[in-house]
């Protein structure tokens, strides 16, 4: 049976935090509370005018006994991974695809633009800083993850993201998905630095036309009744997708972060848990 591995672009899904505290957080909290309770007990013994059998001291001793038992129990499971519901849902999707060929088809204008404009975006980066780049075609994999970064430079992995509009470019940041994707690519390639680059490329006319038609379809009755000006809406949509008049430096946004071995260890432990869950699924 083939071992389940995950693509780097999906790592953010399985690393989605669970609601509430993790086992390690619960363990650390219990250890901290035990230490502070021990301190209070010692202070109580020293400050009491009577002996250590006072009511306050007895209560604290009982609390310490309970906490020691709790710490002992939590220590056994502190490294166990609790998968989030998002992670479980994604693992179930993989199971359905692998076992029955089922796969949701989600194709958006944003996705199409990202694919179509990838080469143009890389060329824009070269024009901006004169550093030679070319689209990476090498596929990397290990026992846990696999993927193919956009660009591999001498010391840096660079992933290029095409922003849909000026608004999405303005709000662009290091999302959890892109963080884990970057960590995965660095681990696969041995690079220690990751550059997440957002680029504003003009949306291809055919995609803009489809976007206009889609928006018009949503407003069909309102447009027919004269509530909206069809030409003005189309003009605004075209404007929202045209950026070539802007200076190049205004069309590029870069975020950088470094390889984190501790996070990679967490990732692989989570994948171990994901495999166990995967093998427990049935129709």
PLM feature spans:
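Charged, glycine-rich intrinsically disordered N-terminal tails and low-complexity linkers that flank
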Residues: 1-116, 120, 124, 205, ...
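Nucleic-acid nuclease catalytic cores
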Residues: 128-275
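C-terminal helix/juxtamembrane-tail motif
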Residues: 273-283
């Amino acid at each position: 049976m083939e071992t389940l591995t995950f693509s780097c672009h999906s790592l953010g899904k399985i690393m989605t935090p669970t609601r509430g505290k993790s086992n390690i957080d619960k363990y650390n909290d219990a250890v901290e509370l035990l230490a502070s309770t021990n301190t209070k007990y010692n202070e109580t013994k020293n400050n009491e005018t009577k002996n250590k059998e006072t009511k306050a001291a007895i209560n604290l001793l009982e609390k310490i006994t309970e906490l020691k038992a709790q710490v002992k129990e939590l220590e056994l499971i502190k490294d166990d991974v609790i998968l989030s519901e998002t992670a479980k849902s994604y693992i179930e999707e993989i199971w359905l695809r692998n076992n029955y060929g089922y796969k949701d088809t989600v194709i958006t204008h944003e996705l199409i633009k990202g694919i179509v404009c990838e080469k143009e975006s890389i060329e824009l980066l070269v024009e901006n800083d004169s550093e030679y780049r070319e689209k990476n075609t090498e596929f990397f994999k290990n026992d846990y993850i696999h993927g193919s970064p956009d660009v591999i430079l001498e010391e840096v992995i660079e992933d290029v993201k095409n922003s849909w509009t000026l608004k999405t470019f303005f709000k662009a940041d290091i999302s959890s998905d892109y963080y884990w994707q970057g960590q995965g690519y660095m681990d696969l390639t041995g690079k220690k630095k990751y550059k997440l680059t957002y680029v504003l490329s003009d949306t291809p006319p055919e995609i803009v036309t489809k976007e206009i038609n889609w928006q018009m379809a949503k407003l069909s009755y309102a447009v027919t009744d004269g509530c909206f000006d069809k030409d003005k809406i189309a003009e605004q949509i075209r404007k929202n997708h045209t950026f070539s008049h802007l200076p190049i430096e205004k069309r590029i946004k870069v975020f950088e972060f470094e390889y984190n071995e501790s996070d990679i260890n967490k990732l692989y432990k989570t994948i171990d848990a994901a495999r166990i869950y995967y093998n427990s699924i049935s129709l």
